[in-house]
């Protein structure tokens, strides 16, 4: 990684995604056109502030990087400690996941006739630079884990809302639905807008 933090990459992504949303595309078009934007962002690992890349030994961390002023989307760095794994959960909004560092596994789930979740389809391994889409329309129930037992992995998640305000659910093996709203691990946003440090007079 470069010693110079390229916050301009994150600013560019935010601006391009906001412009795309301004055109009010349908979901299929949105996911198709936002995919390469996120792929470009995670192709370079020189822009994420260190404060938003710190793992916790007890639990995976979700650092808010940006929320659109109209809450049309949010950008989160998802930091995995070694061997950490989520419960089976849904999202209720569209999302894109881009792998920045390390790798993660995503196992899709479906529900049987009795309402119990079960693995559905192949588990996918997401490598740096790769992007995966999800939504209630194409499938948004999955379980995700760090692919490594001995190191940190980081993925960048983009959601079609302020995910810190969306009521969604985790599911037990018996299909019991437990509502939750995922919070953020940071209390302050990274300052990506002070260009004076990047362009000194």
Curated annotation (Swiss-Prot):
Stimuli inducing this protein: Is expressed in low levels (at protein level).
InterPro entries xref list: CDO_1 (IPR010300), RmlC-like_jellyroll (IPR014710), RmlC_Cupin_sf (IPR011051)
Cofactor stoichiometry and binding remark: Binds 1 Fe(2+) ion per subunit.
Molecular functions (GO terms): ferrous iron binding; iron ion binding; oxidoreductase activity, acting on single donors with incorporation of molecular oxygen, incorporation of two atoms of oxygen
Cofactor requirement: Fe(2+)
Keywords: Dioxygenase, Iron, Metal-binding, Oxidoreductase
EC category: oxidoreductase
CDD domains assigned: cupin_CDO (cd10548)
Keyword Phosphoprotein: no
Top-rank taxon, per record: Bacteria
Annotated catalysed reactions: 3-sulfanylpropanoate + O2 = 3-sulfinopropanoate + H(+)
Alphabetized SUPFAM superfamilies for the sequence: RmlC-like cupins
EC number: 1.13.11.91
Binding sites annotated in the UniProt record for Fe cation: 89, 91, 142
Subunit composition and interactions: Forms homodimer in the crystal; however, there is no evidence that the dimer exists under physiological conditions or has biological significance.
Other remarks on this protein: Does not contain a cysteine-tyrosine cross-link observed in all mammalian cysteine dioxygenase (CDO) structures.
Main function: Thiol dioxygenase that catalyzes the dioxygenation of 3-mercaptopropionate (3-MPA) to 3-sulfinopropionate (3-SPA). To a lesser extent (40-fold lower efficiency), is also able to oxidize cysteine to cysteine sulfinate (CSA). Cannot use N-acetyl-L-cysteine, homocysteine, and cysteamine as substrates. The physiological role of this enzyme is unclear.
Name assigned to this protein: 3-mercaptopropionate dioxygenase
Organism: Pseudomonas aeruginosa (strain ATCC 15692 / DSM 22644 / CIP 104116 / JCM 14847 / LMG 12228 / 1C / PRS 101 / PAO1)
């Amino acid at each position: 990684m470069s010693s110079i933090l390229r916050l301009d990459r994150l600013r560019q992504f935010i601006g391009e995604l906001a412009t795309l949303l301004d055109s009010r595309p349908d979901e299929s078009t949105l996911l198709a056109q936002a995919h390469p934007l996120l792929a470009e962002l995670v192709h370079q690992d020189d822009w994420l502030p260190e404060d938003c890349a710190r793992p916790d030994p007890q639990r995976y961390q979700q650092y808010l990087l940006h929320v659109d002023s109209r809450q049309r989307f949010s950008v989160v760095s998802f930091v995995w400690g070694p061997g950490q794994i989520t419960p089976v959960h849904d999202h209720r909004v569209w999302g894109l996941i881009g792998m920045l560092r390390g790798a993660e596994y995503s196992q899709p789930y479906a529900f049987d006739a009795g309402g119990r979740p079960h693995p559905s389809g192949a588990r996918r391994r997401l490598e740096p630079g790769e992007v995966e889409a999800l939504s209630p329309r194409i499938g948004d129930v999955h379980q995700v884990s760090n692919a490594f037992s001995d190191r940190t992995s980081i993925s960048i998640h983009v959601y079609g809302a302020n995910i810190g305000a969306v009521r969604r659910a985790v599911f037990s093996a018996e299909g019991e639905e437990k509502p939750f709203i995922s919070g953020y691990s940071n209390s302050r946003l990274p300052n990506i807008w002070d260009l004076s440090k990047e362009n000194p007079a």
